[in-house]
């Protein structure tokens, strides 16, 4: 069984969600191939994650269409991104790693 975070997502799904949020914020659109490129994975491995995020009500996704966050997905993505930023600051500034 995969470990889940406090929001019920696996770390991998959290990372996909943040990647979508960053792509939409910076480029206005997210597609499977954009997500695959940003994550360094093959497009075929992105689709199952997108289906799961859609089932959870976090994204709007149809094959061969743009991917967008739902309002709930945006809230979760922002929280995860903020958490990542706090951890980064801690490791870099406090622990000097």
Language model features: what each stretch is:
Residues 1-2:
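Long, low-complexity, charged/polar intrinsically disordered regions in eukaryotic proteins
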Residues 5-41:
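N-terminal helix-turn-helix DNA-binding core of bacterial DNA-binding proteins
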Residues 32-63:
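Canonical helix-turn-helix DNA-binding module
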Residues 65-84:
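Basic, amphipathic "hinge/linker" alpha-helix immediately C-terminal to the N-terminal HTH DNA-binding motif
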Residues 85-97:
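Amphipathic alpha-helical dimerization/coiled-coil segments
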